[in-house]
A protein has these predicted regions:
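Acyl-donor (CoA/ACP) binding surface of acyl/acetyltransferases
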Residues: 1-24, 31-33, 39-154
Length: 154
């Protein structure tokens, strides 16, 4: 699998972006970049597997106050195939390579599910309940930098 940056000027007519999911994500990011800015590498990414887009992931903006939030999404028909875990791993890697001091966070709906399990596998720990403009009450997770993450095991 690979990541492909969702750029400011994607050609929505490309065959690669033909699915309804891709079109929706492209529209979301078109608006989202106007809100958060387009500052590499703190952007959105498509997840590619065998030249097919199977999900997306990204940062919710540039680091602020030494923290950056990650998010990931697997298209429904590809769930359970390790795509979200791959996305989480890659975003952690990008953040650490860009700024090893940045604190990496994530938010989830307030219930245990596949996403919370992925975060726990990557050594994120629950911090507190916070408000999120999309979710409402959300669980805030913070990557525990005191623990070593072995990407081979995740």
């Amino acid at each position: 699998m690979d990541l492909k940056i969702i750029s400011l000027s994607e050609d929505k007519t490309k065959e690669l972006y033909g699915s309804e999911d891709c079109q929706k994500i492209l529209s979301i990011y078109e608006d989202y970049y106007q809100k958060i800015g387009y500052n590499l590498p703190w952007v959105g990414y498509f997840v590619l597997r065998e030249n097919q887009i199977v999900g997306c992931c990204g940062f919710t903006g540039q680091p602020k106050d030494g923290k950056v939030e990650i998010a990931y999404y697997t298209f429904k028909e590809f769930e359970g195939q390790g795509i979200a875990s791959f996305s989480c791993k890659e975003l952690i890697s990008i953040a650490n390579q860009t700024d090893p001091t940045v604190i990496i966070t994530a938010k989830t709906v307030p219930e245990y599910n596949a996403s919370t399990k992925i975060l726990q596998n990557f050594r994120f720990t629950f911090s507190e309940i916070v408000q999120d403009e999309e979710i409402g009450d959300a669980w805030l997770w913070i990557l525990d930098t005191g623990k070593t993450v072995s990407f081979d095991q995740c």
